[in-house]
Swiss-Prot record:
Hexokinase activity is specifically inhibited by 2,6-disubstituted glucosamines. GO terms for molecular function: ATP binding; D-glucose binding; fructokinase activity; glucokinase activity; hexokinase activity. InterPro entries: ATPase_NBD, Hexokinase, Hexokinase_BS, Hexokinase_C, Hexokinase_N. This is Hexokinase-2. Pathway: Carbohydrate metabolism; hexose metabolism; Carbohydrate degradation; glycolysis; D-glyceraldehyde 3-phosphate and glycerone phosphate from D-glucose: step 1/4. Catalyzes the phosphorylation of hexose, such as D-glucose and D-fructose, to hexose 6-phosphate (D-glucose 6-phosphate and D-fructose 6-phosphate, respectively). Mediates the initial step of glycolysis by catalyzing phosphorylation of D-glucose to D-glucose 6-phosphate. Plays a key role in maintaining the integrity of the outer mitochondrial membrane by preventing the release of apoptogenic molecules from the intermembrane space and subsequent apoptosis. The modification N-acetylmethionine is found at M1. Residues 1-16 are annotated as: Mitochondrial-binding peptide (MBP). GO terms for cellular component: cytosol; mitochondrial outer membrane; mitochondrion. The gene is HK2. It comes from Sus scrofa.
């Protein structure tokens, strides 16, 4: 008993010594994590070189665009054919993908041989042979009468220019067909099929096997965005952001990049990592100096590396007693399969002995232990190198997405990964150590290359179908020049109806007289108070207007809130609160008890009877103070001032914010005779000839008309321009049937239009993989600021995804492009409609004055106009196009409503004083 224990101990020690000896000998092949991270860093640099336009020609890692722009989302369906050509045999496959809630793939396939004489004959012979095999397969399945889409896996070095165009760079793997190199292989197949004339197919995509692997796995796991092959050769692909791919135009979306990573190190980047054995393998290969990384990791070379190490150790008398056999000296006699077998057996030492005996050697126990260890070191290095380059790819994807923790799946194929007993496990373990902030899943591809080509085709079909469906839906929102001219014409008609005494009562565009009869002329001076009430906060302002050399406006203001109970209380309580705030402000400014002229911006629907008399028609914006509707707001304010008995104010003017905007800009630019607001709501005003303002007596001079143009279309005159989405937004609004024009152009509603379109797309499976989240059903989540952010040019899709994520919408890159497109279409229409309305206004002013050309300035305010990246530009272009005889400038108003009220007061005081003289 003791003897057997001693013997076992002796062998264990012996094995241990032998292992240490090999470890020391192959010290350079055992890579630390530090070294692997350094390799990952170098690989990152090589990736960037391959992607850059200027560095691509000299880059060793080519990073080739594949024109595959999306991975499967599980909704693909249909029948497809696939051809898989990558060696002496090729396969034809029929693939049916069904999506009825249960993703299912059915396949039929047949393998055809390519005879030696055809491989080395002409290209015409080769492609005729392929077409013949395809015809035979379709005959067998009785599908020759169908024109099916086909995906083609072509695993040779190619330059791809489109999804269905791929030029062969050079034959490999023993092929020598003449007249094919430099040609597009898709054209060659198409011609061969046409020569036969007995069937037709639609060749949609050419892919290589790595992309096929990613796509096959992507159908089962939508997180799959990397494809990896470690077999006879090695390569990888991954989904890159379009903005980083200099060789392909366009910045939006993603595209799969075929890395061709086998060539990593061809420029010397791995010289300090490569060993003498790697150099020897390379020198004896068919392509010296090329594919150096592949030669360190792939199955074609793994057994050969082990053989070279054993030969050198034997020559140095470290193995086999210094003896060599002819078999051991013959290239290719130690196979990668032997490496797998030796490492796979529980008793690997015994397997090592079998292999060594087969090679004509007489190994000792130590020799077998050493051989086992050499196999381990070579295959472990291979897995570690793969992990290092994958770590670089994952880091890049993680940075592209800006995620703190990345969840990603790698689709894998290849004999080394699948058949070596420990390779996969070592690869997974090392990779997780190198990228601890990534959760990685590995998915083995079953039948990657053939099924993958069908999947690429299925995805291309799905994308094309979905694109067509989306364009059809968005078509009614895209307005032609003729349609915009018609909107302009109708706006003009509605303006006339609002101005006319006869039709005013029934006109939706009310064209209300404001009793503001002049814009500033620059001689205004004095101190004025202004009140600005249009929401839950209101402002009190002191505005000092100076003329002469010191001409300008100086402002002081303070914001006060209106508590909910005051908004919903009595009118007296509301106006007492306002007067209390004025008193506080005057004290704050050190002007207690001073009497000043006051201008009042009151942004609620009113009927104005004179400059200082304005009857509130109805409260909006959540106000409900009783006893105010039907009353003159100036009287209510004056009564509250008298009740306080602390100061007296001369209320000179009541205006709305649009008029305020025009007056503020009019102080800077005497040509300013139009005011426009495009923010939460939208409205416009302009200087109309008194003779046309039939509601007010007098023919001389001009008066500013508050158009209330948001109600344009309330009589149905815009129904042929309104879409189902406009109708849906209107129905669910607080004032259904009212303010229809405003609902097509203003910030409060654009987000809702977008949300309704997105819901429609999602219901039809065109977006968010057909899943409607609770958030998407929530009204009002798409604020205007998000529309502005999403359309911002400097924002990458990554940030669009972040905005959608913030809104609780999980989106793919493709989804983000679609959301951006919808936002663009909706905002563009809004800007064009606004421009058409404005063109009607400026043309009316020109015609009123009988001018051939008019130079006029529009004062503008509002968040949509100011913050949206494209709204203003599109609106300006539209006005220019639809009113070519008007030279229109746009001036952004700074603080229109408060300052404007003070300026109207200043103008009124100037005119009053002139009248008194």
């Amino acid at each position: 008993m003791i003897a057997s224990h001693l013997l076992a101990y002796f062998f264990t020690e012996l094995n241990h010594d032998q292992v240490q000896k090999v470890d020391q000998y192959l010290y350079h092949m055992r890579l630390s994590d530090e070294t692997l991270l350094e390799i990952a860093k170098r690989f990152r640099k090589e990736m960037e070189k391959g992607l850059g336009a200027t560095t691509h020609p000299t880059a060793s890692v080519k990073m080739l665009p594949t024109f595959v722009r999306s991975t499967p989302d599980g909704t693909e369906h249909g029948e497809f054919l696939a051809l898989d050509l990558g060696g002496t045999n090729f396969r034809v496959l029929w693939v049916r993908v069904t999506d009825n809630g249960l993703q299912k793939v059915e396949m039929e396939n047949q393998i055809y041989a390519i005879p030696e004489d055809i491989m080395r004959g002409s290209g015409t012979q080769l492609f005729d042979h392929i077409a013949e095999c395809l015809a035979n397969f379709m005959d067998k399945l009785q599908i020759k009468d169908k024109k099916l889409p086909l995906g083609f896996t072509f695993s040779f070095p190619c330059i791809q220019t489109k999804l269905d165009e791929s030029f062969l760079v050079s034959w490999t793997k023993g092929f020598k067909s003449s007249g094919v190199e430099g040609k597009d292989v898709v054209t060659l197949i198409r011609k061969a099929i046409q020569r036969r004339g007995d069937f037709d197919i639609d060749i949609v995509a050419v892919v290589n096997d790595t992309v096929g692997t990613m796509m096959t796995c992507g159908y089962d796991d939508q997180n799959c965005e990397i494809g990896l092959i470690v077999g006879t050769g090695s390569n990888a692909c991954y989904m890159e952001e379009m903005r980083h791919i200099d060789m392909v135009e366009g910045d939006e979306g993603r595209m799969c990049i075929n890395m061709e990573w086998g060539a990593f190190g061809d420029d010397g980047a791995l010289d300090d990592i490569r060993t003498e054995f790697d150099q020897e393998i390379d020198m004896g290969s068919l392509n010296p100096g090329k594919q150096l990384f592949e030669k360190m990791i792939s199955g074609l070379y793994m057994g050969e590396l082990v053989r070279l190490i054993l030969v050198k150790m034997a020559k140095e008398e470290l193995l086999f007693g210094g003896k060599l056999s002819p078999e051991l000296l013959a290239t290719g006699h130690f196979e990668t399969k032997d490496v797998s077998d030796i490492e796979g057996e529980k008793d690997g030492i015994r397997k090592a002995r079998e292999v060594l005996v087969r090679l004509g050697l007489d190994p000792t126990q130590e020799d077998c232990v050493a051989t086992h260890r050499v196999c381990q070191i070579v295959s472990t290095r291979s897995a570690s190198l793969c992990a290092a380059t994958l770590a670089a790819v994952l880091r890049r994807i993680k940075e592209n997405k800006g995620e703190e923790r990345l969840r990603s799946t790698i689709g894998v194929d290849g004999s080394v990964y699948k058949k070596h007993p420990h390779f996969a496990k070592r690869l997974h373990k090392t990779l997780r150590r190198l990228v601890p902030d990534c959760d990685i899943r590995f998915l083995r591809s079953e039948d990657g290359s053939g099924k993958g080509a069908a999947m690429v085709t299925a995805v291309a079909y799905r994308l094309a179908d979905q694109h067509r469906a989306r364009q059809k839906t968005l078509e009614p929102l895209k307005l032609s020049r003729e349609q915009l001219l018609e909107v302009k014409r109708r706006m003009k008609v509605e303006m006339e109806r609002g101005l006319s005494k006869e039709t005013h009562a029934i006109a939706p565009v009310k064209m209300l007289p404001t009793y503001v009869c002049a814009t500033p002329d620059g001689t205004e001076k004095g101190d004025f108070l202004a009140l600005d009430l249009g929401g839950t906060n209101f402002r009190v302002l002191l505005v000092r207007v100076r003329n002469g050399k010191r001409r300008g406006v100086e402002m002081h203001n303070k914001i006060y809130s209106i508590p909910q109970e005051v908004m919903h209380g009595t009118g007296d309580e509301l106006f007492d609160h306002i007067v209390q705030c004025i008193a506080d402000f005057l004290e704050y400014m050190g002007m207690k008890g001073v009497s000043l002229p006051l201008g009042f911006t009151f942004s609620f629907p009113c009927q104005q009877n004179s400059l200082d008399e304005s009857i509130l028609l109805k409260w909006t914006k959540g106000f409900k103070a009783s006893g105010c509707e039907g009353e003159d707001v100036v009287t209510l304010l004056k009564e509250a001032i008298h009740r306080r008995e602390e100061f007296d104010l001369d209320v000179v003017a009541v205006v709305n914010d649009t008029v305020g905007t025009m007056m503020t800009c009019g102080y800077e630019d005497p040509h300013c005779e139009v005011g426009l607001i495009v923010g939460t709501g939208s409205n416009a005003c302009y200087m109309e000839e008194m003779r046309n303002v039939e509601l007010v007596e007098g023919e001389e001079g001009r008066m500013c008309v508050n158009m209330e143009w948001g109600a344009f279309g309330d009589n149905g005159c815009l129904d042929d321009f309104r879409t189902e989405f406009d109708a849906a937004v209107d129905e669910l609004s607080l004032n259904a049937g009212k303010q229809r024009f405003e609902k097509m152009i203003s910030g409060m509603y654009l987000g809702e239009i977008v949300r309704n379109i997105l819901i429609d797309f999602t219901k039809r499976g065109l977006l968010f993989r057909g899943r409607i989240s609770e958030r998407l059903k929530t009204r009002g989540i798409f604020e205007t600021k998000f529309l502005s952010q999403i359309e911002s040019d400097c924002l990458a899709l990554l940030q669009v995804r972040a905005i959608l994520h913030h809104l609780g919408l999980e989106s793919t890159c493709g989804d983000s492009i679609i959301v951006k497109e919808v936002c663009t279409v909706v905002a563009r229409r809004a800007a064009q409609l606004c421009g058409a309305g404005m063109a009607a206004v400026v043309d009316k002013i020109r015609e009123n004055r009988g001018l051939d050309t008019l130079k006029v300035t529009v004062g503008v305010d509002g968040t949509l106009y100011k913050l949206h990246p494209h709204f203003a530009k599109i609106m300006h272009e539209t006005v220019k196009d639809l009113a070519p005889k008007c030279d229109v400038s746009f001036l952004e108003s700074e603080d229109g409503s408060g300052k404007g009220a003070a300026l109207i007061t200043a103008v009124a005081c100037r005119i009053r004083e002139a009248g008194q003289r």
